UniProtKB/Swiss-Prot annotation:
Keywords for the protein's UniProt record, in alphabetical order: Ribonucleoprotein, Ribosomal protein
Single Gene Ontology BP annotation: translation
Stored PANTHER family: 50S RIBOSOMAL PROTEIN L32 (PTHR35534), LARGE RIBOSOMAL SUBUNIT PROTEIN BL32 (PTHR35534:SF1)
Extent of Basic residues compositional bias: 9-19
InterPro entries on file: Ribosomal_bL32 (IPR002677), Ribosomal_bL32_bact (IPR044957), Ribosomal_zn-bd (IPR011332)
Protein's name according to its UniProt entry: Large ribosomal subunit protein bL32
Family statement drawn from the similarity comment of this UniProt entry: Belongs to the bacterial ribosomal protein bL32 family.
GO molecular function, one term: structural constituent of ribosome
Listed Pfam families: Ribosomal_L32p (PF01783)
Organism taxonomic ancestry: Bacteria, Pseudomonadati, Pseudomonadota, Betaproteobacteria, Burkholderiales
Amino acid sequence: MAVQQNKKSPSKRGMHRSHNALTVPGIAVEPTTGETHMRHHISPNGFYRGRQVLKNKSEA
């Protein structure tokens, strides 16, 4: 079983935890439809950066 050799000070403990913060996901708004989607992903109806890259199943 691992046992620490020296106690970690509150400062070092805080430095160790500094990378554990949660980040807000990058949400983008599609300019043509106004829908929200994750950045660098297509919107649910097939648009990416203002142009349609996938056709809808009803159109195909």
